[in-house]
Design a protein with these regions (language model features):
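Ser/Thr-rich, Proline-interspersed low-complexity disordered segments
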Residues: 1-34, 136
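Extracellular beta-sheet/turn segments enriched in Thr/Pro/Gly and aliphatic residues
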Residues: 23-40, 109-136
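A short, Gly/Thr-enriched small/hydrophobic beta-strand-prone motif that recurs across taxa
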Residues: 32-54
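Short, ordered, surface-exposed loop/turn motifs in non-cytosolic proteins
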Residues: 56-73
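Short, acidic Ser/Thr/Gly-rich low-complexity loop/linker segments typical of extracellular
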Residues: 70-94, 107-116
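A short, solvent-exposed beta-strand micro-motif common in secreted/extracellular proteins
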Residues: 96-106
Length: 136
């Protein structure tokens, strides 16, 4: 009798593990400019916030947290696209001091309060702040 041929086994290839993408936390927004706004046409004192990306375009949907002695409020950019996609504003109560932080560990801006402005025609009134943040 003739022996049956023995099967030779080819070595099987073991797939290399696939690399999983690691998310890199992007750096937080940093304050680029803080401008006092004295405009008698604004009916109430505001904190006007602009968040821009590296190309200078507004970034919508970013949470901004404002705190004061007995309160806190969150606002979001992008709700007033007619002004700018990266724009948000908050109405200040005169003589209250606010602290602002862009979510995600951004720079803390403290001691924000309605500045006093004066206009020859309309006298004294409460001013506003314009804060422009950039994403490095």
């Amino acid at each position: 009798r003739t022996p049956l041929p023995t099967a030779t086994h080819e070595p099987t290839r073991t797939a290399l593990p696939t690399r999983t993408a690691t998310t890199t936390l992007s750096p937080p927004f940093v304050l680029d400019k803080q401008i006092q706004v004295c405009n008698p046409n604004l009916n109430e004192p505001q904190i006007q916030i602009f968040l821009n990306d590296g190309a200078g375009l507004g970034v919508p949907g970013v949470q901004i947290i404002l705190t004061w002695d007995d309160g806190q409020e969150s606002i979001f950019t992008g709700l007033k696209p007619d002004i700018d996609l990266g724009y948000a504003d908050f109405v200040m109560t005169p003589e209250i001091v606010y602290t602002l932080q862009v979510s995600g560990g951004g720079q803390i801006i403290s001691d924000l309060f309605a500045p006093e402005c004066e206009d020859e025609g309309s006298g004294r009134y409460w001013g506003s702040w314009r804060l422009i943040f950039k994403h490095p």
